[in-house]
Structure formats: C-alpha cells, structure tokens
Amino acid sequence: MLAFLFYGLLLAACGSVTMSNPGESSFDLADRLDPVEKIDRLDLVEKIGDTHAKVLEIWMELGRRREVDAAEMHAICRVQPSATLPPDQPQITGLVLFRQLGPGSRLEAYFSLEGFPAEQNASNRAIHVHEFGDLSQGCDSTGPHYNPMEVPHPQHPGDFGNFVVRNGQLWRHRVGLTASLAGPHAILGRSVVVHAGEDDLGKGGNQASLQNGNAGRRLACCVVGTSSSAAWESQTKERKKRRRESECKTT
C-alpha cells in the first residue's frame, strides 16, 4: 500500500513532462530537462522519498502499538494470612489469578483458597481490592477499598462480591470483572483482601455498608503483581478437570 502511494507521488512529480519517444527512458527524460527544472524535479523526488520514509515509520509504529495493545496480560496474587491475625482465626492461603486479553477487555479471575473452617460449609466470604499494596501491618495497612471513581460500594472496580466456601475451600472462576490490569486505574501493586464475613452489597443501611459492605475482619491478603501465563494455564486445566468430574457425578 505504501509502495503504491510512493509510486503515485513519483509519477505525479514527472507527470507534466511528456516523452517524445515511446521508448524513451526516465534517464533520457531527465537529460531533456533544463538544469533549473531538473534541480526542481530532483528536489521534489527527494522530498517524496523523505515523505515515504516518514509514512513508513509511522505505519511501523502503529503496528508496534497494535501488538502491545493486543498483548494478553496476566497477574498473580499469593494470598497469606494477615500478620496481625490472632492465632485462633482461620489461616487462609491460596492464589488469585487474573487475565486480561487487552486494555479494553474485561478482566477475568481464578480464586483458589483454602483454610476456612470446614464446619461452616456453604458460608459466604467477601473478597475486595484495597487501595494499597502495603502489608507492613498485615492486611490492616492495605487501606480502604480501591475506589478511584469515588462511587459507593458495591460499584468499586475491585468489589468481587461473595464467594461460597465448601469443605473449607473456595474455588471460583469469574469473568466480566470491572477491575483492570491496564490504564490509569490498574489494580497492579494494590492488594486483594479476603474478609471473615459476607458482603451486604451496600444494603446494610449504614455508612460502613456503602464503604465496605460490613464484610468483617481482614483474614488474609496479597499484592497483585504481573506474571507469566503459566499459573493461569494450570488453573484452566484444573477447571476442565473439575468440570469432567462434575459431569461424571451427574450422569
């Protein structure tokens, strides 16, 4: 495409001069031009060449940007019990994995956690993104919910909602999350916090409900960091395995 554009410009540069002989070459044509006109023509051709080079450079840069924009992004968060948590509280560990196909795509995540009280089967636990990645005082130093748009809970980008615990474990794949790994509101470097209670989803009738859903004590947390796709691919295989096992049980 760029080559055709350049060729067209070159033809336009020489279009006003006709060849007296059908077999005359472009070199013969250049010899027939008077010195001043020849200099003007050569200068024009040189400018066209410069323009072609600039257009080509812009085209290549756009291609590089498209590759970057289309790049799949992954992140990982290794959940550990809060350093300030009393020993009689559940010791939650596990992984939260994120994948985003591009800056404009919706985020998806795997949540794989264990250590919840087994006797509290089918209980709901809230998980949120908090503003800071500061774990110096355990999960207590992660700050409030990450809320860059200053909207009420549960519209914060990291309000992941409630997760059902079964047999002391939590495993869930969620898609269409409003949080992002790219852009000015990316959650990279921020924290994911697992709470002791259920999120009331802003329906608790008090100020705390509109801030944090009255989700209770911060049991465990982690800091979101970029990663390769390896952990995500492993969880995807685990998900397929779980589906097969579930299908076998229902047949």
UniProtKB/Swiss-Prot annotation:
Residues 1-15 form the signal peptide. GO terms for biological process: response to hypoxia. Its main location: secreted. It is an enzyme of class 1 (oxidoreductase). Binds 1 copper ion per subunit. Binds 1 zinc ion per subunit. Gene3D superfamilies: Superoxide dismutase, copper/zinc binding domain. Residues 230-251 are annotated as: Disordered. Disulfide bonds join 77-222, 139-221. Cu cation binds at residues 128, 130, 145, 195. One of its GO terms (cellular component) is extracellular space. The keyword Zinc applies. Keywords: Antioxidant, Copper, Disulfide bond, Glycoprotein, Golgi apparatus, Metal-binding, Oxidoreductase, Secreted, Signal, Zinc. Its EC number is 1.15.1.1. Its cofactor is Cu cation; Zn(2+). It is found in: Secreted, Extracellular space; Golgi apparatus, trans-Golgi network. Glycans are attached at residue 121. Zn(2+) binds at residues 145, 153, 156, 159. GO terms for molecular function: copper ion binding; superoxide dismutase activity. It catalyses: 2 superoxide + 2 H(+) = H2O2 + O2. Belongs to the Cu-Zn superoxide dismutase family. Homotetramer. Directly interacts with ATP7A/MNK; this interaction is copper-dependent and is required for SOD3 activity. This is Extracellular superoxide dismutase [Cu-Zn]. It comes from Mus musculus (Mouse). The gene is Sod3.
